Regions:
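Carbohydrate-active catalytic/glycan-binding domains of CAZyme proteins
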Residues: 1, 5-212
């Protein structure tokens, strides 16, 4: 863990949240969002392959965390290979959280140059309480293997999604646009990064957006 004060980063001792769920019990691709009620929500990848969901916990101070929950968002299709990089987006219009992730379902989409176990598409669900969820739906099929999507809102009816083209040898970042977070999303743009880039983060520093 790290903390920042006066623009200086310091490490913090100890482990505050040890992954205890999922087949491999790992914590990759963490995504955290604070809602207006002061609660921080955290989701993460629990296994490289074999899990049909992702991990979830919440906190009010980023130190003390709730009991971890496994959210089986792909339980409806047991042929699913993985659930990767769940990303949180707070939908202020509906006061709910949207979770976007990448999953591979062999044989479901045109394979392209990737093998069936690496042919990902983006899916989503929405929730107000992390107890009840909307049915899992396909969010984006750009015609190639896609992972690591993050959504940001620029204005009313103006949403941007930064995503990774996961096909070889591209492995770069592209952009799509929509009038609402559920889509429909525009065709992916041309790449705006070099190859072998992933896991984008988008931060607004008026009037610009920084993508890291």
């Amino acid at each position: 863990q790290m903390c920042i004060r006066d623009r200086h980063w310091d490490s913090l001792p100890g482990t505050w949240l040890k992954p205890e769920i999922g087949k491999q019990r790992i914590m990759r691709d963490p995504s955290i969002v604070a809602t207006p009620n002061g609660v921080f929500h955290l989701v993460w990848t629990t296994s490289w392959r074999g899990d049909l969901g992702f991990g979830y916990a919440h906190s009010t101070d980023l130190v003390n965390w709730s009991e971890e929950k496994f959210i089986p968002v792909m339980k409806h299709d047991t042929t699913t290979v993985n659930v990767w990089a769940p990303e949180l987006f707070y939908d202020d219009c509906n006061n709910e959280l949207m979770i976007v992730w990448a999953s591979c379902i062999p044989g479901k989409f045109e394979r392209g140059i990737e093998d069936e176990n690496n042919n990902h598409r983006l899916y989503y669900t929405k929730t107000k309480d992390f107890t009840t969820f909307t049915p899992t739906k396909l969010l984006f099929d750009p015609g190639f293997s896609v992972i690591d999507a993050v959504i940001t809102k620029r204005a009313e009816k103006d949403y941007v999604m930064v995503l990774k083209d996961n096909t070889r040898p591209n492995r770069n970042l592209k952009i799509s646009f929509a009038q609402q977070p559920e889509g429909p999303w525009s065709p992916a743009s041309q790449a705006f990064t070099e190859s072998f880039v992933e896991g984008p983060t988008v931060v607004q520093i008026d009037p610009n957006y920084l993508i890291d």
